[in-house]
Swiss-Prot record:
This is NACHT, LRR and PYD domains-containing protein 11. It comes from Homo sapiens. Keywords: ATP-binding, Leucine-rich repeat, Nucleotide-binding, Repeat. ATP binds at G153, E154, R155, A156, S157, G158, K159, T160. LRR repeats lie at residues 588-611, 632-655, 745-768, 802-827, 859-882, 919-944. Transmembrane segments: none annotated. Residues 147-470 form the NACHT domain. Involved in inflammation. GO terms for molecular function: ATP binding; oxidoreductase activity, acting on paired donors, with incorporation or reduction of molecular oxygen, reduced ascorbate as one donor, and incorporation of one atom of oxygen; RNA binding. It comes from the Eukaryota.
Length: 1033
């Protein structure tokens, strides 16, 4: 890195100001300093001043050289030279402020909302500035070594403005005095354009001609602040191996290596970071957010929102009326947490007030607000009514918006604008209307005032007959350097909003144009929802759909859409989510199963004395949600997962579950924590007269909970017949408590204990209880309980003598041949009542199959046998077929998935299909049967002697002849069902829903995009949606 050519950085000039005697002393001091700084040594004694001045810069980094020189000059009392270095450093600090002042010229000052926001954030951000002041003060309790300060906030929430204001305050001497000497500003966009760089080059990028005083900037890293904006938008992962990190500020390295070296302080140790990001907290954010770091969130609180409205309207009465409208709807509250969206809302409401319109009727949803914003901005110029020019402007704007989103482009070049037909005059109109503005992160580019406006225009494009178009910035060569956009849920929401005739009328009346695709999409969506249950790509959860319906709010249309829903999954993370879900669930007249997750709403929010207004609002919504459990006539199953309930919210849930009108038959609780340790909840269930299935999974079961469960099951009126305690970390020490449940003499008929490390010791305790005369258990599920052959003798006794046990599931336990022999041997005796035995994944081989075949041939009670994922092989299958062909075999189901079978056993299997008159279900998935083997089985399936109703066959890779035979089977036996799932996916094998609040997990994609992207209007555009050449609408 070239430094200034003045004497400020001229080493020789400094050395020549030393006498010969002083120079000799200097070299001795320098040798010691090199050792102190732990730098590589070289011979100094014989060097001249010129030689030393030439050698130092190629041997050491500049900051080390000048720090050593300053220290030596101080020890030598060369005050004139020290003053010169101090003066240079002071000038460079001022020069840095000048560089930052130029860079932070506030672009928004040229726009109405920009000036307004500058003043607003300056007035209301004192709390953030206070945190930033303390965080970088090494003497403050708030500070820590190598501190990162994270400024979190949604898109356009004011993060950039607050950062700019903080830097301007530093420039003016109002912040970080004697704490920060230099600021280096980086944005995700700048970083995404780079491939390799040195730290010196990175620092110098904003300085005139790239000439920065690197030595002075890095001389004291503890006074150096790096500002990194939009960490979540960096296009590459920062999971760099420690061994690849670099400490040399002049060495060029890949950008990920450089950033991680900085963030982990391998470079510039002791420096500070101010990082902005959206609260989604992507992988890069989670990688670097440490416990000691400071994290503050930017959003407009109720108090700040009130200040905003009062400042905007300058009329308290109008501001109060506008605020009341916003506060009546959580969607609008959420919208107005973001400053620019708040500005759009206020702008629209003010225009409606100025026109004397009833704004409370015409501005109820974001669709209303965005429609009014676009219509007013594009058609109100000089009082003109809409004409073809305005309509053309709207169409081109929507084409640009849609083309941008489908190609992950949010910042548009001049070429992009020209390609969709915009002239310079058009751009000036859009800029004056505050729709399209110069980008504050991408030089010489434009962007929509907010992503929501681009999404709204994309929704209009969806319902317009606009052509497909590839904007230049969306081409493959820019793929790695542009933003990521993949969540189209807001676009879908706006589309549904525009399906409402009243909301659509705002645009259609203003522009004199009707959106041509409305009716076709409306009826398409109704048909799609009616067939949703038959679609393998059906919705995984319903929140995005519910937001769409809430935005629409046409009662008959909403009813029609949700009428077919019998199962709904909702993730509730805010009051807004609860409000929207309540609205839609109220129309779900045929709902039988509700799966519910409540995250972060009540977590760690136990009121100290009485609930705050905000907490009360959440509790009111929660009470309404819970009331559905006893007011929905059709609701029979409730799954609550990934929930953190405080005391009040748990009591509200408990009251609903004990309500006399509650008709729930099934209650499943997974990853649920409660303030009372489930005491309130379980006491409520004791008073529930309809519940037959209780599942408490993925939860620690305390002794008190066992006691409460015992009391519930002992209640004469208790109807619970199936209790599931999967993945609750139950061990042998808890088996005495489980045993007490078994002998309680109550209603319990089925117990599921899967995925608990009971081990053989625990199983032996349970076996004693299973033989107790009070035990009336019919079904026991012990999948993956760490059982071995050591407990199988005890299990055998249970099977031999239990008068009630009919079903036993021991899948995924290491029983081996010895254990399986002990478990199956009792089935040869008439006292054994077992009807279903599941031994999949129990590590036995074909050697034991002769004994299983005898059981199959002699036990007339056995109806179901699951032995998949064992090493049965063709030899074992031949033996089993002998048992299956025996006239005394009464099996209805046999599971043989993943048993290492080949075509060699298929002739015997085929004969079973035509001779066995009871077998209705056979699963052979994940076996390599080949074309010949599958063909033999298909030929038997055609036979009228075959009574099979359900079959699982490996059908991939079949040749044409076998595929034709398969089609023949399906034609002749249309009722025959072909399975696609194995034993591991059956009911009772699942562990529970992975909690979205756990680190590294997120709410899954809902698959709502399938409905939109399968719509014929979209198919051409989205056919290549996951490729670099994705086409826009």
């Amino acid at each position: 890195m070239a430094e200034s050519d003045s004497t400020d950085f001229d080493l020789l000039w400094y050395l020549e100001n030393l006498s010969d005697k002083e120079f000799q002393s200097f070299k001795k001091y320098l040798a010691r300093k090199i050792l102190d700084f732990k730098l590589p040594q070289f011979p100094l004694i014989q060097m001249t001043k010129e030689e030393l001045a030439n050698v130092l810069p190629i041997s050491y980094e500049g900051q080390y050289i000048w720090n050593m020189l300053f220290s030596i000059f101080s020890m030598m009392r060369k005050e004139d030279l020290c003053r010169k270095i101090i003066g240079r450093r002071n000038r460079n600090q001022e020069a840095c402020k000048a560089v930052m002042r130029r860079k932070f010229m506030l672009q928004w000052e040229s726009h109405t909302f920009g000036k307004f926001h500058y003043k607003f954030f300056r007035d209301v951000s004192s709390d953030v500035f206070y945190i930033l002041q303390l965080a970088y003060d090494s003497t403050s309790y708030y500070s820590a070594n190598n501190l990162n300060v994270f400024l979190m906030g949604e898109r356009a929430s004011g993060k950039t403005i607050v950062i700019n204001l903080a830097v301007l305050r530093w420039i003016k001497g109002e912040m970080w005095q004697n704490m920060i000497s230099y600021v280096v500003h980086l944005t995700a966009h700048e970083i995404n354009q780079m491939t390799n760089s040195s730290l010196a080059e990175l620092i110098a990028k904003d300085w005139p001609d790239g000439q920065a005083p690197i030595a002075d900037i890095l001389s004291d890293p503890k006074k150096l602040l790096f500002i990194l904006e939009d960490l979540d938008n960096i296009r590459f992962e920062l999971n760099v191996n420690e061994s690849a990190l670099c400490s040399n500020s002049t060495q060029k390295v890949p950008i990920p290596v450089l950033l991680v070296s900085l963030l982990k302080r391998k470079m510039a140790p002791g420096c500070w970071f101010l990082i902005s990001s959206r609260p989604t907290r992507g992988n890069n954010v989670k990688t670097f957010l440490k416990e000691v770091d400071c994290c503050t969130t930017l959003q407009l609180s109720n108090g700040k929102r009130e200040i905003y409205f009062n400042s905007f309207f300058k009329d308290r009465q109008r501001a109060s009326a506008a605020l009341q409208l916003v506060h009546e709807d959580e969607i609008l509250v959420g919208l107005c947490r973001v400053a620019i969206l708040c500005w759009i809302t206020c702008t629209v409401l003010k225009r409606q007030m100025d026109k004397g319109r009833d704004f409370q009727l015409c501005c109820q949803t974001p669709t209303d607000l965005h429609a009014h914003f676009l219509a007013d901005a594009l058609t109100s110029e000089a009082g003109l009514t809409a004409n073809q020019y305005h309509l053309g402007l709207l169409k081109r704007l929507c084409l640009l918006a849609a083309g941008g989103l489908f190609l992950s482009t949010l910042n548009f070049s001049g070429e992009d604008l020209r390609c969709v037909g915009f002239t310079e005059a058009d751009v000036s109109v859009l800029q004056a209307a505050n729709i399209l503005l110069p980008s504050n992160t991408h030089k010489d580019r434009y962007k929509f005032i907010h992503l929501n406006v681009q999404e709204f225009c994309t929704a209009i494009a969806f319902l317009m007959a606009v052509p497909n178009y590839l904007i230049p910035s969306g081409s493959r060569e820019y793929k790695e350097k542009r933003e990521q956009y993949s969540d189209f849920n807001q676009v879908f929401t706006f589309i549904f909003g525009l399906l409402n005739a009243n909301r659509r009328k705002i645009l259609e009346t203003s522009f004199g144009y009707q959106l041509p695709m409305v009716d076709s999409f409306k009826w398409y969506s109704v048909g799609y929802m009616k067939h949703l249950d038959r679609d393998p790509e059906k919705l995984t959860h319903h929140m995005p759909l519910f937001y769409c319906l809430y935005e629409n709010r046409e009662e008959e249309f909403v009813k029609t859409i949700v009428d077919a829903l019998m199962e709904v999954t909702v993730y509730l993370q805010s009051d807004k989510d609860m409000m929207v879900s309540l609205y839609c669930l109220d129309y779900c007249c045929h709902l039988r199963t509700l799966k519910l997750s409540v995250q972060r709403i009540f977590q760690n929010k136990e009121p100290l004395i009485r609930p705050t207004a905000s907490q009360m609002k959440s509790l009111v919504y929660w009470r309404e949600i819970c009331s559905l459990f006893y007011t929905m006539e059709s609701l029979r199953e409730l799954h609550i997962f990934d929930n953190d309930l405080n005391g009040i919210s748990e009591r509200i849930l408990s009251k609903a579950l004990e309500h006399s009108s509650c008709k729930l038959r099934t209650l499943k609780l997974s990853y649920v924590s409660t303030a009372s340790g489930f005491e309130d909840l379980l006491k409520a269930l004791a008073r529930n007269r309809s519940l037959t299935y209780l599942s408490i999974n993925c939860t620690s079961i305390s002794l008190n909970m066992f006691s409460l469960l015992h009391d519930i099951l002992h209640e004469p009126t208790c109807q619970i017949s199936h209790l599931s305690l999967m993945k609750c970390d139950l061990r042998a020490s808890e088996c005495e408590e489980i045993a007490s449940l078994l002998i309680s003499g109550g209603s319990l008929r089925k117990l599921t204990l899967s995925s608990n490390p009971l081990r053989s010791d625990g199983m032996n305790i349970l076996c004693d209880a299973l033989l107790h005369p009070n035990c009336t258990l019919i079904s026991l599920v012990l999948v993956f309980c760490c059982l071995t052959e050591n407990c199988c003798s005890a299990l055998g006794r249970v099977l031999l003598f239990s008068p009630t046990l009919r079903q036993l599931d021991l899948c995924v336990n290491r029983l081996k041949n010895y254990g399986v022999l002990h478990v199956t041997f009792p089935l040869l005796f008439p006292t054994c009542q077992l009807e279903e035995l599941h031994l999949s994944g129990c590590f036995f081989s074909s050697d034991i199959c002769q004994y299983i075949a005898i059981v199959i041939a002699t036990n007339e009670k056995l109806r179901s046998l699951e032995i998949g994922s064992n090493k049965i092989e063709d030899a074992g299958m031949q033996l089993l077929c002998g048992g299956l062909r025996h006239p005394n075999c009464m099996l209805v189901n046999i599971g043989l998935e993943e048993c290492m079978l080949t075509s060699a056993c298929c002739r015997s299997l085929a004969s079973v299909l035509t001779t066995n008159k009871t077998l209705e279900r056979l699963n052979l998935l994940q076996n390599h049967l080949g074309n010949d083997g599958v063909a033999k089985l298909l030929e038997s399936l055609i036979s009228p002697d075959c009574v099979l109703k359900v079959v699982g066959l490996p059908l991939t890779g079949l040749n044409t002849q076998t595929q034709q035979l398969l089609m023949t089977v399906k034609e002749r036996k249309p009722s025959l069902i072909f399975l696609s799932e194995t034993w591991s996916l059956k009911e009772g094998r699942e562990i529970g829903v992975t909690p979205a609040s756990q680190p590294g997990s997120i709410i899954p994609n809902s698959n709502l995009d399938y409905m939109f992207f399968k719509f014929p209007r979209m198919s051409a555009a989205m056919r290549t949606s996951n490729t670099a050449s994705r086409q826009p609408l």
